[in-house]
């Protein structure tokens, strides 16, 4: 019973830390313009980017009637990447990395999140998403997001 209580308490503390971190991710410092702290669009969902980064490439638009499923799978990934790049191009450049990080953070975080090696791969892909879309330099996403221990 003690172990269950401690797990619940740990989950509560972890979710509170995650919520506080999520509030910080939405802002950025204005650079040469001297405008100070500005707000990025909060609540922006990049579902296609999230699904692409998490290897959820099945689009289910055309269910394959073929035994060559790998062709269908690859096509789904490329379609998601195209949609993701299109969505990223509509974001302010200074907000892209924060929005990318926010889109995958809930899947990587928490007590029962991804395994460590899988998390590192997803974060690396997220860092390289803007250059892959020809939309600026790589993101500086810390490789420790999602872990509280």
UniProtKB/Swiss-Prot annotation:
Acts as a membranotoxin, probably through its antibacterial and antifungal activities, contributing to the defense mechanism of the plant against predators. Forms monovalent cation-selective ion channels in membranes. Contributes to grain texture and hardness. This is Hordoindoline-A. Residues 1-19 form the signal peptide. SUPFAM superfamilies: Bifunctional inhibitor/lipid-transfer protein/seed storage 2S albumin. InterPro entries: Bifun_inhib/LTP/seed_sf, Bifunc_inhib/LTP/seed_store, Glia_glutenin. GO terms for cellular component: extracellular region; membrane. Its main location: membrane. Found in endosperm and aleurone layer of developing kernels, but not in the embryo. The lineage of its organism: Eukaryota, Viridiplantae, Streptophyta, Embryophyta, Tracheophyta. Coiled coil: none annotated. Five disulfide bonds are present. Keywords: Antibiotic, Antimicrobial, Disulfide bond, Membrane, Plant defense, Secreted, Signal, Toxin. CDD domains: AAI_SS. It is found in: Membrane; Secreted, Extracellular space.
């Amino acid at each position: 019973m003690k172990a269950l209580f401690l797990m619940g308490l740990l989950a509560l503390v972890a979710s509170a830390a995650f919520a506080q971190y999520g509030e910080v991710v939405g802002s950025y410092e204005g650079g040469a313009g001297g405008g100070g702290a500005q707000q990025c669009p909060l609540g922006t969902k990049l579902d296609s980017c999230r699904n692409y980064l998490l290897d959820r490439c099945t689009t289910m638009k055309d269910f394959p009637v073929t035994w060559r499923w790998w062709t269908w799978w690859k096509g789904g990934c490329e379609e998601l990447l195209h949609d993701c790049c299109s969505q990223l191009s509509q974001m302010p450049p200074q907000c892209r990395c924060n929005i990318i990080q926010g889109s995958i953070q809930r899947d990587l975080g928490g007590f029962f999140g991804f395994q460590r090696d899988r998390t590192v791969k997803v974060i690396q892909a997220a860092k390289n998403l803007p250059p892959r879309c020809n939309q600026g330099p790589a993101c500086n996403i810390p490789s420790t997001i999602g872990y509280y221990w």
